[in-house]
């Protein structure tokens, strides 16, 4: 599964610096800046390219990587969809769940 689309969640996010790029990972969750409520949050925004990835997967050699920065606020751990996403990501990293990890 590796997450549903179009969900809203309040949480603190990381803003990645160079050399972060989508060119070597498959982003599974990112901020939707077309949403007025999300776009209105300007305090502390440092990225100028509008690319705010929150979770991704990638293959590294013979291994698999799952990264997710969700979880700064307590409410995140009460969201069944987020918990399912964590489980899917762990299963992907273990090799128990297939997912397309090609960058896009």
PLM region descriptions:
Residues 34-55, 59-104:
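Extracellular ligand-binding/catalytic regions of CAZymes and related secreted enzymes
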Residues 1-61:
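Catalytic beta-strand/loop cores that center a nucleophilic Ser/Cys/Thr
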